[in-house]
């Protein structure tokens, strides 16, 4: 079996350069084929320099709606602009029915990220406003930076798009506190993203644009990074989805790949 280490090469950190210098690891495609899923997984190992591999070079640089993975930059922007006062702020539930029962309660920033509370982040975006939102997306070099489609839904059904490669670049900048934002605010959001903590730490966020149709599928995401010993592994996964029953695959497929590489599990 050929492992990640056999495929990675040094990559530059501009979006175009990274997309053109990732190595393709077709061995990973067996996990996608086993589930009859079209998708991509990008995995980058950060040692002295970043080295990356993917199962699908073309799809790695193709842009999709970020859906709820956008909660990561949205939270940072909210903190930077003062819309979110600090990590202790409580977002009050107004008592009105919401799409998911787990959203029908008061939530902290971490809680809102963990349950992916769309209404909370829509309100944050409305208070940030278009001018400041646009400014920060440009500062972050986040996707196509297109916020057309409504200030409270441009990442859900509007025109914002981002590739798996760009997700990895953004996450690496966040990990290194190199975004154009205060170190304190980046640390707050990083802490809120911790989803697992066994012998390694996983900081991650899922996203889901809706199921779509067979001819026009939606997209499901899982992005983040794994801290294991002295190594950090950044990852971004997305897949076409036309059946909600397939949603768990957004985590199970990349988890299997990372387990096969000895990064998590085992």
From Swiss-Prot:
What positions does the entry give for substrate binding? 205
**Catalytic positions?**
68 (acyl-ester intermediate)
Identify the Pfam families for this entry.
Transpeptidase
* Hydrolase among keywords: yes
> Origin, by domain of life?
Bacteria
Give the source species: Escherichia coli
Per the record, what are the reactions this protein catalyses? a beta-lactam + H2O = a substituted beta-amino acid
Any single GO molecular-function term of the entry would be:
beta-lactamase activity
Please state the Enzyme Commission number of this protein. 3.5.2.6
Q: Name one GO biological process term.
A: antibiotic catabolic process
- Protein name stated in the entry: Beta-lactamase OXA-7
């Amino acid at each position: 079996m050929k492992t990640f280490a056999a495929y990675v090469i040094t990559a530059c950190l501009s979006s175009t350069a990274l997309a053109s210098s990732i190595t393709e690891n077709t061995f990973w495609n067996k996990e996608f084929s086993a589930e009859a899923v079209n998708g991509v997984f990008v995995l980058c190992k950060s040692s002295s320099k970043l080295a990356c591999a993917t199962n699908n070079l073309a799809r790695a640089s193709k842009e999709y709606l970020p859906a709820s993975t956008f909660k990561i930059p949205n939270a940072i922007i909210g903190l930077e602009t003062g819309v979110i006062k600090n990590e202790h702020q409580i977002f009050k539930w107004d008592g009105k029915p919401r799409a998911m029962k787990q959203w029908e309660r008061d939530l902290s920033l971490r809680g809102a990220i963990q349950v992916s509370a769309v209404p909370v982040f829509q309100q944050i975006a409305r208070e940030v406003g278009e001018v400041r939102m646009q400014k920060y997306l440009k500062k972050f070099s986040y996707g196509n930076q297109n916020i057309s489609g409504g200030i409270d839904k441009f990442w859900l059904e509007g025109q914002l798009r981002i590739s798996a490669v760009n997700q990895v670049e953004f996450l690496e900048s966040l990990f290194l506190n190199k975004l154009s934002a205060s170190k304190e605010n980046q640390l707050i959001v990083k802490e809120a993203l911790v989803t697992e903590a066994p012998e390694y730490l996983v900081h991650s966020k899922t996203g889901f644009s809706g199921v779509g149709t067979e001819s026009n599928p939606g997209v499901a995401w899982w992005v983040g990074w794994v801290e294991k010993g002295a190594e950090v592994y950044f990852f971004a996964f997305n897949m076409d989805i036309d059946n909600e029953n397939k949603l768990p695959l957004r985590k199970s497929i990349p988890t299997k790949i990372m387990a096969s590489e000895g990064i998590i599990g085992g």
